[in-house]
């Protein structure tokens, strides 16, 4: 059976705020009705009901600044901010980023690939044995420690292909915040004919020897000599309005690759065109924290701090949930959120030669760790596989790694993760550096953590072993000053 493999370059970032009349209001339960009535607001939906109530509200006034000033001056209000619209673009054009890794090796690995058993499912060998896993010494770590992951990783993204053969055994029920309904299937964004065509192995939308780019905006980034571009005549399967379809499934596949016995909770806060609202992301964080998530993986960022987002982050941290966020693809030393919030593990992208990816944001204010983010092969809807570039695909490596730590040290708190994973390959301006799972996890187990793998014999222990030891790996002398 032939399966298509695609190249994907993406990270969630915020669009500039436009004039709007929707806001996120936070007030105590005893004051919220008074605030709404006093300022002529209309409640659209409740985002969270706890010590404070968080509401999505609207105002009939088009004067955004005036409404903000008026409501924020009310002493009964905890916070008040405009709703933000977010999107899932390709690598940010502001950096004119170029990829340092040739796609030739990726293409070569797709030809004549074999199928292998991986913890109860059959997957392509180039998924379990690839450059990214070799760099972080995943296979060596798994062999030495028998750690395969525990707990639940909630992924806030575009959903997931709940029927993907590699993922069905580890997915737990999620929620679709874009439709306000249980379940988080990415295929719900497709019309039935398109969904059926995607899952056909003989659809013939491309030659099996080619690798695709889903969005023409990436043409300037990817090498023309090694990349097949999606022909416009084939867009009846996945048209341009669905440019970010598959992103959530790709993130889920990376978590599963690192931590194959951890469970995954897909939370759909983004549409297939990459659009979302800040209110849905806030709801998703609260939902994850209240519904058993051990880790929340967030491959998105916004450029301005948000009181509502920060409150949701703090709530999750208070419930001992580990939060991981992509650092952004602007190629800048800048702050983005939630990666720059205290307690959040901000993840940058590194290359196959252990340098900072050209597109990755950097600096101690936004990056706690780096992980490979170029040419990472992972799952894609329809039982397919794809290769991705971007900090979107670095973040889930750390999310998976966090569950390995939790398996060895079940009582670990969010801050402990930083310490236990800090035996790294140092990279300038990339926090503690590029994660080294063998160095960190063997140190963890040997220092007294108990390892009790739930699935030591349930499948291949692949995730490639490095053929050379990383002599420069080791704890950094002083970590980053993360805000």
List each language-model region with its residue ranges:
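Protease zymogen maturation seam
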Residues: 72-152, 160, 165-166, 184-194, ...
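Structural recognition of the beta-strand scaffold that forms the well-ordered cores
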Residues: 24, 56, 81, 152-155, ...
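Extracellular S/T/G-rich loop segment that most often corresponds to the catalytic His/Ser-adjacent loop
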Residues: 179-180, 220, 321, 336-407, ...
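Inhibitory N-terminal propeptides of secreted protease zymogens
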Residues: 19-100, 149, 295
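Gram-negative bacterial Sec-dependent N-terminal signal peptides
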Residues: 2-19
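Mature extracellular/periplasmic domains of secretome proteins
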Residues: 142-148, 253-259, 275-297, 306-324, ...
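C-terminal subdomain of the subtilisin-like protease fold in secreted/lumenal serine endopeptidases
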Residues: 45-46, 280, 289-300, 307-312, ...
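Subtilisin-like peptidase catalytic core
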Residues: 151, 158, 171-173, 177-304, ...
């Amino acid at each position: 059976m032939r399966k298509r493999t695609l190249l994907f370059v993406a990270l969630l970032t915020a669009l500039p705020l436009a004039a709007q009349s929707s806001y996120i209001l936070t007030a105590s339960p005893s004051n919220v009705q008074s605030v709404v009535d006093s300022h002529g607001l209309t409640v659209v939906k409740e985002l969270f009901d706890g010590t404070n109530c968080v509401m999505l509200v609207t105002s009939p006034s088009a004067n955004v600044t005036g409404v903000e000033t008026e409501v924020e001056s009310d002493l009964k209000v905890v916070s008040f901010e405009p709703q933000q619209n977010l999107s899932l673009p390709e690598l940010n054009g502001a950096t004119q980023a170029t990829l340092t890794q040739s796609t030739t090796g990726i293409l070569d690995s797709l030809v004549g690939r074999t199928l292998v058993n991986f913890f109860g499912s059959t997957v392509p060998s180039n998924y379990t044995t690839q450059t990214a896993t070799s760099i972080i010494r995943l296979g060596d770590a798994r062999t030495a420690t028998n750690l395969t992951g525990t707990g639940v990783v909630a992924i806030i993204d575009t959903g997931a292909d709940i029927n993907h053969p590699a993922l069905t055994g580890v997915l737990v029920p999620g929620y679709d915040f874009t439709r306000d309904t249980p379940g988080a299937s990415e295929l719900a964004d497709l019309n039935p004919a398109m969904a059926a065509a995607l899952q056909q192995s003989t659809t013939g939308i491309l030659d099996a020897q080619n690798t695709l780019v889903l969005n023409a905006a990436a043409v300037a980034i990817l090498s023309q000599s090694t990349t097949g571009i999606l022909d416009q005549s084939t867009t009846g399967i996945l048209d341009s309005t669905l440019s970010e379809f598959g992103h959530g499934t790709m993130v889920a596949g990376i978590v599963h690759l690192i931590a194959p016995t951890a469970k995954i909770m897909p939370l759909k806060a983004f549409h297939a065109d990459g659009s979302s609202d800040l209110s849905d992301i806030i709801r998703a964080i609260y939902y994850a924290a209240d519904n058993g998530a051990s880790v929340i993986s967030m491959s998105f960022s916004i450029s301005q701090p948000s009181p509502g987002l920060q409150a949701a982050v703090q709530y999750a941290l208070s419930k001992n949930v580990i939060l991981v966020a992509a650092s952004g693809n602007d190629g800048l030393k800048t702050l983005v959120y939630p990666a720059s919030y205290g307690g959040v593990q901000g993840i940058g992208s590194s290359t196959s030669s252990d340098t900072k990816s050209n597109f990755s944001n950097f600096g101690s204010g936004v990056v706690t760790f780096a992980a490979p983010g170029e040419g990472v092969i992972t799952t894609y809807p329809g039982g397919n596989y794809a290769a991705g570039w971007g900090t979107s695909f670095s973040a889930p490596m750390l999310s998976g790694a966090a569950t390995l730590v939790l398996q060895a040290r079940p009582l670990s708190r969010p801050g402990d993760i930083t310490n236990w994973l800090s035996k790294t390959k140092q990279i300038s301006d990339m926090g503690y550096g590029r994660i080294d799972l063998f160095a960190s996890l063997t140190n963890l187990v040997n220092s007294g953590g108990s390892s009790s793998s739930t699935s030591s014999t349930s499948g291949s222990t692949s995730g490639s072993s490095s053929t050379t030891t990383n002599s420069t790996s080791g704890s950094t002398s002083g970590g980053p000053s993360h805000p």
